[in-house]
Structure formats: C-alpha cells, structure tokens
Amino acid sequence: MLIFVSTLIIKMITIQNNKLKATFSELGAELTSLINLETGKEIMWEGNPDFWGGQSPVLFPTVGALKNEQYIFEGKTYELPRHGFARRRVFDIKNSSENEVIFELKSDEESLKIYPFEFSLEIKYTLVENKLTVSYRVKNLSDKEMYFSLGAHPGFAIDTENGMNYNDYEIAFSDDEKLEIHPLVNNLISNDTQTIELDNKTLPLSYELFSKDALVMTTMKSRELILRNNKNNHKVIFTFFNFPYLFKSFLTFDLIFKKVLTKINL
C-alpha cells in the first residue's frame, strides 16, 4: 500500500501470523493497525485527528517537551520539537519477513541541524503467537557522548459498543503500587507530586482522572500492565523492560514509555 504525503510516497508494510496482523508506516516506523485475527477486533486507536492523530508514534531523541522547545549543547542553542523528530521522519526498511520487520533511521544533514549527534535508531517488530514484541537499538556513530531519550506512545482502542463505555475499563498493575504522580505544568513535568492509591492493584479509568492532562509516574515498580474491560474478557497485556518512566493520558487510552540514557557508545 502507498500513501502520498505532500511530495513523499509513504509505504505501508504488513506482517502476519495465525493470530495477529500488524500494519506499519515508513513514516515514523509507526504501528498503525493491530488486528486480532480470531475476533477481527482492531486493537489500535484509529488516529482520529479531531482528538489525536497519532496511533503509536516513536518518541526520539526526546520524550515530552523542552522549555521553549530549546536546549543548549556545547554553548550552542538548538530547537527540538515536542517528542523529538523521529515520528516525522521516513525510516528505511532494513529487513522484513512474514512475521517481522526492522526499521532504521540514521542521522543526516537535516537532523544534525537540530540534534548534533550521529546516530542509528533501529526498531524491530516481531509477531510471536498472540504477541507483538518491539525492541529498540540506538547506536552512537561518533566518538562523543550522545544524549537522548527514547519513548513508545501506543494508543489502544476502547470498546464503546454494546453499552460499553470508558468507565468500564481499568489498568491492572503487576506489583502493589502507591503511585506518585507528577503533574504537567505548561507541558513540563512538575517536581510536585500527588499520590494515587490502587484498589487491589487496579486503577479504574475515568475522564476525571485525566482532567489535568497526562499522569506521569517516575517510581512505578510494575513491569506489566493490563488494560482490561471489567464487563467482558477484552484486554491488552503490556510488558516492558528498561523503560523506567510511565505517562498515561486520557484520549482513548494511550501510554508513553520513556527510557532515558545519558550516554551510549557502541
């Protein structure tokens, strides 16, 4: 499938096994569809631009916003947009098979103007039975320290048919948690915190919960979350490793997983 965006031709690629069918865009190496072949149910948020046009953007080389969208490195001021630039760049398809695809984005003349580091970002998507695994590899292609953040921002569809609504969903945590939430102030994370107590390791969803924007959690122990409907068996199990910070926002249901590495040399 081809999609025309301005003067660019964006290629879509699909991988599939006997359980799942996943579709990706070269633009941002973004997962745009994940279908349960047994039920025909679409798992991903549709990307309605009236609410949120994204579906599963990759956040690199920053997660969230910088103050005034600027930072200083080696005495020079650079401008970097919210969530970085990877989601707006066309990735190369490095390799693909029936059930796996590897995307790659490399630094170039344009990226060096706003992010003065030579890098390679590889994202591998693999279908294994009823699981989609995603792995990331960032390479520093120079001999100087490279600063970056890396985040995943998948949005999952909420079933509102057959009398279901947003309040019928909850998040189950793998560990006992006392969640410390950092509020967002002018799109920046505040040092202030508030505590949310879980009920039997679960957090019921409500629009009120997200009335002040996303929830930012920096001390969470759980490495598995389950988004589930408490009236039926519909659920999405999300496991993640080496991503210490969690953001949750209210549009349908989306997660931002953030990994911060101060330097990497490979």
Task: Please report, for each region that a protein language model flagged, where it lies by residue.
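Buried hydrophobic-core signal for structured, non-transmembrane domains
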Residues: F24, G75, V134-V138
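Extended, loop-rich substrate-binding clefts of extracytoplasmic carbohydrate-active enzymes
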Residues: T77-E129
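Active-site/ligand-binding surface loops and adjacent short beta/alpha elements
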Residues: I158-F243
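Acidic, contiguous internal or C-terminal segments within carbohydrate-active enzymes
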Residues: S107-P154, D159-T160
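N-terminal amphipathic/basic-hydrophobic helices that include classical n-h-c signal peptides
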Residues: M1-I10
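Active-site pocket scaffolds in enzymes
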Residues: H234-L266
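Short solvent-exposed loop/turn micro-motifs enriched in small/polar/acidic residues
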Residues: L8, T62-G64, G84-R89, P116-S120, ...
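Beta-strand-rich N-terminal accessory domains
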Residues: I10-Q70, T77-P81, S222-F241
